[in-house]
Every structure is written in C-alpha cells, then in structure tokens.
Amino acid sequence: MNRKAEILYRLGEPLAAGMFEHENSSVVERFGLGLRRYFEHAAPPPESGRLYPAPEHDIWNLAGKFVRFHYSFSLGCDGDGLRRLGRERLADPFERNLLDRVIDELDYFRSDLIPPRYRIGGNGWTHCVLNYRRILGEGLGGYRKRVNAMPPSPLRRALSDTLAGITDFLRRAPGDIAACAEHPARDFRSAMRSFNFFFALDCYDSAGRFDDYMGEFYNGEPDAQMWLEELYCAVDLHDGWHFLHTAKHPAFTRLCLRAQKLRRPNSGLLAGPETPPEIWEELFDVWGRGVPCPSVYNEAAYRSGIRHGSDAKGADRDRFAFGGCTELMFEGCSNIGSTEGGLNLLDILNNSTPSRFRADIRLRMEEFASAVRANSEFAAQYRPQLIRTLFVDDCIDRNREFNAGGARYYGSIVNVAGLTDAANSLAAMRGIPEKFGNDSPEVDEIARKLAHHVFSLIRRYPMRQGGPAYPAVILLTGYAWHGSYVDASADGRPAGAPVVDSAGAVAGTDRNGPTALLNSVAKLPSRLGIGTLVLNVRLQRSLAASRTKRKLLKALLRGFFAQGGLQLQPTLIDQETLKKAYENPAAHPELIVRIGGYSEYYNRLSRELQFEVLKRTEHMI
C-alpha cells in the first residue's frame, strides 16, 4: 500500500487514505476511492426515529474526521488538527514529512481563486438541488444501472466506487433503509425515509419543490406532520437550507407549513393569484407564531425573468427552485454558483467619483467575472463532486463530472452589496435629502437607474462554465463586514457601519409606512435580478392575528407582486420583545429573525447585527 495512505489509515482518516492509495490516478478516481473508503469505514448510527439517519446523527462526520466531504468545495480539511494528530502518533520524522505533503496537497484542492474584495456573500460557493423526483422514482438501483451502462472512463470508475461505498454503508445500516434507498418509493413512509437519506448525503443542502414531489406520495397519513417535524429538526440541526412550496398539493402544503417551527428549513412559498385561500391562512398562522418562514416569492415575476434572462428551455423553466438562502437554480439539472461573490457598490462609489462610477463598476465586474471563470476551471480539474454527479442530470448521460460540464445548466449568482446605500449617497451628492424606501420619486429613480445599469452590466458576462450571470441581493450576515472596510459615505452613514441588508431601505430610514417601502422596491428592475432581490421587512406581529388584518396584509403582498416585486421575507416581532431580547439575548433562545437572506436565532447573531435588526422600522397597517 502507498506509504501516505498507510499513514492516513493509521491516523483514522479513511477518506484521505483512499485518495492516496493510488495517487497517480486521475483526480476524479482518487476522490471516488476516497468516498468509497470513507463509507466502508463508517459505522452506521443506530436507528432512533422515523427517519434514517435520525436528526442527531451526521453521515459525513460520524467520527469527527479531520478530512471530510464538503458539499460545496468537495473536501474539508482541518490541516492544523491533522498535523497535531501526526505529531502525537507519528514518531518517524519521514512519516511526519509525508503527512505535511499530504496536507499541502489537500489544501491545494481547496484553493480559492476569488479575490477577497469580491467575496460578497460567498466565494465560489455552490448550493444545489439534487433530482429528488428521479431518486424517488428510480431508487439507487436505477442509478447503478445507468452508471454500469456508461462507457469505460475514469468518471465511471469513480462513480462505481462511490456507489459501492454507499451500498456497503446501507447494507450495514439498521432497519429497512437499504431497501427504501435501493428501490423506487412506494408510499409516503418509504419516500420520506429515502428522501432523508439522500438529502443527508448532500448535507441537507436544498430540497427544491419539496411539497410538489413529496405530495405525490401523501395519502392522508395521520402522522405525516410528525415525519415533517423530524425532518425539519434534522435540517435545523445540520444547518440545512432551502425548501420551496408550490401548493400543487394544498393539503400536504398546509402540513409542510404547519410543521415549520424552527429557523430551518429556510423555506419559501410560490405565491400568485391562484394560491388557495387556505394556504394564505396557513402562512399567516406560521408568521403569527413568530416564525418568519416561509418567505413569499412572486411566481409570475420569476417566470418572466427566467424567460428573458436564463438559458433554461421548455419544461425545465418550470423546475426553477432556490438553493441556500434563496438563490435561483433549476431543480435536479443545474450547477449554479451560489453565491460566487459579487460587487460592493458603496465601496466602489467611495473610491471613485460620480463621473467615473460606472466605468469603475465595469472594471470591477470584468475582474470578478475573470476570477469566477478561473475558479470554475480549477473546480473542474481538482474538485469533483461525485454525489452531485450521480444525482444531477445530465452528468451520467454526458459522462462528465458535475463541475466539468456534466450538468444541463450552469451559471453564477452575482451578489450586489450596498445598492441602497449607493443610491442614497448619489442622491445626497445631488442635494436630495430623501432616502430610498419612502416612495420618494427622485431617490427611487436614482436607485432604479443604478440597479438597471448594474444588473444589465452583470448579465453581459459569461460566468461558471460559460453560463449566465444572475444578479442578486443576498447578503447573509456579511453585510456588517461589507461595511466595515468602507469609509463614511455621502448619505450620512458613518465609517465602518454596515451596508443595507437587502434590496430595501437602510434600517430605520423607511418612515412612510409599508406601502411606501414596497412601492420603492417595486420600482427596481426585478426581472433583471432573478438571482434574487431579497427584501427584509419588519412587520407588527398583530398583522397576522386577526382576519381583518390578514386581509390587509394579503392585499399588501399581492399589490407588491402586481407591481413586479420579486420576494419578501418578514420578521414579525414587536419592538418591546425585541428590546428585551437585545438586552438579554440568552433569555430568548427561540426568537427567530430574518437576517440577510435567511432565518437565524436572534441570540446567535453578533451584537452589531442584533442592533441592526432592532433598528429596522416596525411596520403596521
């Protein structure tokens, strides 16, 4: 056996050991053997609930390895921890030197080619939605047949090793999970168990149109909500991401909404004129409990934007969903960089002049797009994603790996930070005192023109694997950092203060009510920003309490969407409760707020971000 592999086995690192058993093989074969060895050495956890693995267990870190699978970057490596382990267990200096060389190579696989100034909400990150419809329809056995039918190639050998490892793990797992995963789902129970296993394989990333495909198996099972609550618990514990609900199966969708009691999944509801009244009522019930999920999406606006701004064709346009926070992608057939990074408009403006501003934006975008393409090519060579290659169309059919052109669609989410701040600053330079978010024509027009220019510019550049760029405003918790290095700006923002956290108003400056705020945001060219233009809004919790208030809230949302608004995510907490939570966060462990593009427990936020949430205007109708 290769000496490096032998050392890694002794140190209890089977994934890394497998990668070095035949280190002169192709990179994709090395990753495939690494995954196989990981699963062969992993002890399946016990069965302790309806789902397998149960929420408290993690397929990918069962023994706390230093070298781990990573769903976005293929590999995670705690090099310092592995070196410490080597110093403890390896007496031979030659073996220690070999281990250092191993760690250097593993670190190389994780190389990040996105310059720090462009790491706006991401740095070549990749969320994904596997083809769960096909998984439930074919089972693992169907995928095995398709891999066996591939022509001989390094990729086929890598996928065969990956499948062999998963199959070995399932064979040793308790209960009937092996049968559920191997065969097509036959009922709600087997569908939920199979889905959960494959979702865990992809690290609970994003589920796509969950109520659509899972609703096909729902037949009024009395314990269905308990299954959903256990699944949501797993998603919350493992920092999973997005579930989209379409209301195609209203009875099941209502259960999905009713089960939402935690900060995750980061769910969304496609809304439109045909959304059933009972779905709206269930949505307001959830919001009324203080849970800010799901957010609402304007289905018609996305469909229009996708027709004009994506390369998706035919029925695939109906498969749009969201990954991560709320990044556009196409269910089961796409590899969309989400988020790749982006541009900080306020930083660019502060280091430019009004006359040079647009030219400087273009120069930054050229540099960023070049970095994204270079990072994409590096990933194609050195970061194979074999789980996604198996379960995303058309990788098997094309005999090409997920990062190397196998998926049907590619593209990149390009984040825009400081949009509102820059618009307010440009307005101030022209002597306009109003702030965006108050339905003030002059500053709103400045924001509209700026957004139109920037989004149109972004869309001109080919990105990951030559795919389109999708402009977005999705800042996670990073909006504080993206303001920390920016000097004081013309709008009155002090040096180092956070930039705006969404496509809406700077916190506390929207003073003319919710209709004015939504009117301002609706003027932005949302059809050009389908990456998603996140809108964070604080609403008075009582709005979801009474039937009369609910009618007004529904009318407000539908009016926003009728004007072209794209997305809205609320935080429904009264100011008094939020003040108490700010004074003593530990006393409010279950308080959930919307931050950037997702939900988070308030007591987990930094003090700076807690204060930013407190500063937001609390709107009432």
Place the predicted regions along the sequence by residue.
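Conserved catalytic cores of very large enzyme subunits
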Residues: M1-L159, R186-I621
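Long amphipathic alpha-helical scaffold segments
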Residues: A178-H183, N196
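Low-complexity, highly charged intrinsically disordered N-terminal segments
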Residues: L159-T162, I166, L170
